[in-house]
């Protein structure tokens, strides 16, 4: 057990670098009163405004207030009034002096120990969302939508302050369902002290609902009661017959759907879930929540269909592996902590997802596995599994960041894990220098020890992954001069990336298998898959190249990611 704990600690050492301690407020959203204060100060006629990199050199005295948007702001001299930095970092050089307050929104402050700040220092890590109307700033009223929102179709909402009605939305395009479309009402009622929500949807699958002799239509019916506004308790339950991905942690829904629709490359495996679930959630702080759930459901395999793809349509889809079929009772305890300054473009803060799962049930039909991975299940099955995803985002200069991530997960005790709960280190979401589901014996990515079943499913009982990423701002602009004035005709903001990854999977309940490691041990670090890579990230999409280091014969891989790698 000591070896297991020691090696786990070594993998997570980079994540435990302490964050800079400051007078700061972290959270997913900027308080509205602060947003209004920022806009008022920026729009004041007496404020000296700038919207790009700004330097106040040594020896210069600025008599009033200063506001900088985007920045960074570098102060070497003296500001007699207040200083406001919006979505910008502030760098204070030795001898810098600010007589008034220093307010930073969506940024960090460096060098304060060498400078003098006469007023109050406040740092709010969430970025300010705003619209510029000429030279005036207006605070945006709506929060940004999640990247999957582009899937929504045929949506109608009644804008009264007590009800909302959604007619339909779509899920993730995949090789098993095609496009799953949820049709039905979602009713929402705001009660002041909280809210009530009820949804009843039929799931129509374009790949199977209209082509099979037996209509393949799923459903989700559920409701929840929330007590509290920003903080509070949520109680709910649902009934469902739906298709679920085996490993949803590696790539986002948007990435999986786009890769499937455009290139007929589906990076997930799927199984059917039919049953019900009860859950309770507690949100006690701005940055953390706790969820407890219990489900009674039946699992079954699903066959891959032949949905259309825009490109490479002549290439056959990868077989969807046959997984374990049976009835299971599954209990989960999930903790989520998120202090990132921004959900979609973070450069400061922590993110933690920790999940403990206990399952009991009977496997009626066992899915095929590689020789020696497990004995054929018989009788009841009981297992315990954990999954930990820990990330740290660090701004190390006004224009660069060093981000690290560690993932540990897998079997804890009991019987061997069902195939639906097994894991892998494979593909562009983990160690992208290696091809997804590539063939080979003693594969530490999927734990196929020799011949693999059709579709090459994930068979690992434990995994470990470490990712390191260096990001630096990149600004590309084309401009010209007319009548003595410089005009920008084209501008793209992004970042260039260097990254390194290391990870592998292994077995713990397969004596005699070359991929089996003791239950209390960790694999030797020399056996891990490793790679190096780089790329350009333009916020919405990034293009990268990665080369495997641990296996030199692997070719260079070029791939796209939607938003950031992690």
Where are these regions (language model features)?
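Outer-membrane beta-barrel initiation region
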Residues: 21, 25-30, 34-44, 51, ...
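C-terminal outer-membrane beta-barrel translocator/porin domains of Gram-negative envelope proteins
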Residues: 231-279, 309-500, 506-508, 558, ...
């Amino acid at each position: 057990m000591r070896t297991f704990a020691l090696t786990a600690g070594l993998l997570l050492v980079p994540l435990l670098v302490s964050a800079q301690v400051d007078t700061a407020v972290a959270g997913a959203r900027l308080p509205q009163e602060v947003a209004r204060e920022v806009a008022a100060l920026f729009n004041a006629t007496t404020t000296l405004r700038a919207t790009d990199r700004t330097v106040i050199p040594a020896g210069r005295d600025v008599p009033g207030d200063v506001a900088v948007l985007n920045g960074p702001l570098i102060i070497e001299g003296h500001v007699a009034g207040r200083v406001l930095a919006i979505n910008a970092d502030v760098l204070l050089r030795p001898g810098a002096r600010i007589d008034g307050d220093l307010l930073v929104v969506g940024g960090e402050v460096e060098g304060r120990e060498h400078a003098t700040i006469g007023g109050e220092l406040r740092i709010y890590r969430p970025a300010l969302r705003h619209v510029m109307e000429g030279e005036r700033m207006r605070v945006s009223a709506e929060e940004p939508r999640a990247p999957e929102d582009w899937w929504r179709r045929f949506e109608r909402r009644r804008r009264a302050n007590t009800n909302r009605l959604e007619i339909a939305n779509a899920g993730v395009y995949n090789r098993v369902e095609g496009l799953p479309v949820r049709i039905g009402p979602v009713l929402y009622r705001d009660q002041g002290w909280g809210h009530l929500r009820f949804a009843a949807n039929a799931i129509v699958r374009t790949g199977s609902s209209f082509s099979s002799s037996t209509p393949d239509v799923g459903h989700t019916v559920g409701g929840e009661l929330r007590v509290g506004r920003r903080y509070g308790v949520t109680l709910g339950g649902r009934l469902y017959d739906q298709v679920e991905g085996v490993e949803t942690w590696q790539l986002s829904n948007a990435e999986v759907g786009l890769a499937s629709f455009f290139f007929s490359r589906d990076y997930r495996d799927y199984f059917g879930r039919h049953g019900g679930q009860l859950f309770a959630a507690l949100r006690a702080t701005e940055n953390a929540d706790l969820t407890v759930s219990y489900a009674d459901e039946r699992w079954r395999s699903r066959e891959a269909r032949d949905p259309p793809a825009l490109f490479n349509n002549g290439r056959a889809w990868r077989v969807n592996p046959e997984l374990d079929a049976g009835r299971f009772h599954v209990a989960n305890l999930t903790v989520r902590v998120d202090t990132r300054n921004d959900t979609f473009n973070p450069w400061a803060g922590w993110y933690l997802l920790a999940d403990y799962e206990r399952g009991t049930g009977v496997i009626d039909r066992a899915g095929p596995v590689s020789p020696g991975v497990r004995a054929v299940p018989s009788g009841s099955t009981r297992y315990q599994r954990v999954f930990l995803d820990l990330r740290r985002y660090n701004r190390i200069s006004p224009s660069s960041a060093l981000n690290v991530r560690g993932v540990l997960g897998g079997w804890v005790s009991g019987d061997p894990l069902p195939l639906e709960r097994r894991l892998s280190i494979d593909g562009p979401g983990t160690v992208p220098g290696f091809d997804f589901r590539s063939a080979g014996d003693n594969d530490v990515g999927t734990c196929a020890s020799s011949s693999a079943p059709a579709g090459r499913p994930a068979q690992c009982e434990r995994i470990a992954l470490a990712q390191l990423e260096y990001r630096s701002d990149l600004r590309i602009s084309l401009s010209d001069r007319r009548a003595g004035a410089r005009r920008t005709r084209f501008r793209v903001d992004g970042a260039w990336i260097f990254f390194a990854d290391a990870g592998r999977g292994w077995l713990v309940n397969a004596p005699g298998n070359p991929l089996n490691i003791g239950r209390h041990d960790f694999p030797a670090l020399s056996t891990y898959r490793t790679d190096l890579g780089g790329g350009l990230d333009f916020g919405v999409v990034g293009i990268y190249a990665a080369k495997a280091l641990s296996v030199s014969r692997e070719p260079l891989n070029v791939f796209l990611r939607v938003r950031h790698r992690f």
